[in-house]
């Protein structure tokens, strides 16, 4: 029945619009693993990359965005979005994370890396990028926590996906009440 089919399409599209947005910056090994994990989750996942070849082979159902200026994607993202930053370049990570932290409506801002990378980012963010301690305090780094020391991309991705889904569920909970 064409009428029922049309109604089903409208309901499906409305449901997808209501999903929280997760932007995965970086399409390397961890980015691909994160995209695969998030393809099964109730999120609108988008992998953002500056290198076209890294967008090949992404999980079905995950959107991709090729752009020379990933921080513009951060600016255009809807309120309540989550940002997971794991590019191939620390300087690029810093620019993207700084842009995300300037938004007070981001549900999650996470960056892959070590304690040293986080400390270096903090110094740059406060001294050079004009960030505040309050903004910096919202950064989750390393993504996925520190309890599990396994550095395999699939493990990092699974831990980070669980962390992000928890934050998104808590962020959405007040809206459901």
Regions found by a protein language model. Give the residues of each.
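Segments forming oxygen-rich coordination pockets for charged ligands
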Residues: 1-50, 58, 163-177
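Structural motif
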Residues: 21, 81-83, 108
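Residues in the short beta-alpha loop(s) of Rossmann-like NAD(P)-binding domains
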Residues: 51-52, 115
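Short loop/helix-cap segments at secondary-structure boundaries that form the rim of catalytic
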Residues: 53-62, 76
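Conserved SAM-binding strand-loop segment of SAM-dependent methyltransferases
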Residues: 62-68
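Short amphipathic alpha-helix with an adjacent loop that forms part of the alpha/beta core around
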Residues: 70-79
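ADP-ribose/adenylate-binding Rossmann-like module
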Residues: 88, 99-124
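Adenosine-phosphate binding glycine-rich loop
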Residues: 112-177
